[in-house]
Structures are given as structure tokens and as C-alpha cells.
Amino acid sequence: MMQPSIKPADEGSAGDIIARIGSLTRMLRDSLRELGLDQAIAEAAEAIPDARDRLDYVVQMTAQAAERALNSVEASQPHQDAMEKEAKALTQRWDEWFDNPIELSDARELVTDTRQFLRDVPGHTSFTNAQLLDIMMAQDFQDLTGQVIKRMMDVIQEIERQLLMVLLENIPEQSARPKRENESLLNGPQVDTSKAGVVASQEQVDDLLDSLGF
């Protein structure tokens, strides 16, 4: 059975493809400029197989770290409140004793309460230190989520680079939009679209897309 021959796309179809690629590239460029948030992330996720899972992982890790930190703070608060309350009470009692020395039995009770407070302080501080350590350990999610986010950004940038290469290699010369002299001066150095792989900065990317009419 003979295979049907593949005919080259007509100029109209090629123009539509180039226009769609240009629009997609502009969308990715704007998404990167806005840190890939909101709707841009949802659109980019359509082109990246596991992007949603990666973002969900980042959200889960961030939520877990926040919950651990809040739980540790809530657990430590009663210990801090107890030490503060007891310290203020003992300070007031000692101030009153210095202003008006009390009987020996009352002084002994004051000393006994003070010694008990001092014995309790290490327990409170040890518990609080453990909670502070847990808060610090909860921040290790930043290393993992940072790697995931960096990987996603690398993928998006690579998609953008490949799309730009397609435009540079296949755009017809007559499709480039001519620019007035004043407009060129305002936009600074322009991109040489006759060579592949010459895009080196965000400004050049935007200039290229503008010159192609996207």
C-alpha cells in the first residue's frame, strides 16, 4: 500500500503556526516576568507533564513547615507565660520584703518559693529550646522546594528558548515588522534575526517578538 506523500504546508498554514508559536512565546515571556504566578502557572503546567505535581509538592511542604512552626510556638507559649507570671510575682514579693521586712517564717516561705522557681526554669527553657529547634528544622523544606522551583523555571526557560529558535530559523524575512528610526533608538540595540542562537537577554527577547509583530 502506497503511503500518501506529505505536501508542504502552504504559506497561510505556516503563517498561522508561526503566529501561534509567537503568541505562546510571548505568554511564556510574560509568565517569567511575573514570577510564573496565577494563571500563567496554570497555562505553563499544560505544557509540562508533572508541573502540577511539582507545584502541589511545594505547597504541601510549605504548609507542613508553617504548621510545625505554629504548633511549636503554641506549645512554647504556656511555658513562657508561666515563667513571666511567676517571676513578676516573686519580684513584687521581694520588693515588699525589702521595703518592710516580714517575719522569719514568711521570709522562709519566700525563699522556698524562689528556689522552686529557679528549679523550674531549666525545664521551661529546655522545652522552649526544643520547640525552637523544631521550628528551625522545619525550614529545611526550602532546600527541597527551591530545587523543584528551579527545575520548573529551567524547563520553562528551555521551552522558551526552543520556541525562539524555531522563530529565528523559520520566520520569513518579509514578515518582520519594519521599525521607524525613532522607535529603534528608543528600544536600543536590536536583534540580528538572520542568525540562530543570538538571543542573549530578556530585552532582546522582547525586541525580537516586537519586531516579528507578536
Swiss-Prot record:
Enzyme class: hydrolase
Residue stretches of biased makeup (Polar residues): 184-193
EC number of the protein: 3.1.3.-
Entry keyword annotation includes NAD: no
Region Disordered: start-end pairs: 176-199
UniProt GO BP: archaeal or bacterial-type flagellum-dependent cell motility; chemotaxis; regulation of chemotaxis
Chain positions of site Enhances dephosphorylation of CheY-P: 147
Signal peptide interval: none
Molecular-function annotations in GO: phosphoprotein phosphatase activity
Pfam family for this entry, one: CheZ
Localization per Swiss-Prot or TrEMBL: Cytoplasm
InterPro entries per UniProt: Chemotax_Pase_CheZ, CheZ_family_phosphatases
Cellular component annotations (GO), alphabetically ordered: bacterial-type flagellum; cytoplasm
Keyword list, A-Z: Chemotaxis, Cytoplasm, Flagellar rotation, Hydrolase, Protein phosphatase
Assembly description: Homodimer.
Role: Plays an important role in bacterial chemotaxis signal transduction pathway by accelerating the dephosphorylation of phosphorylated CheY (CheY-P).
Family statement drawn from the similarity comment of this UniProt entry: Belongs to the CheZ family.
Protein name: Protein phosphatase CheZ
Taxonomic classification: Bacteria, Pseudomonadati, Pseudomonadota, Gammaproteobacteria, Enterobacterales
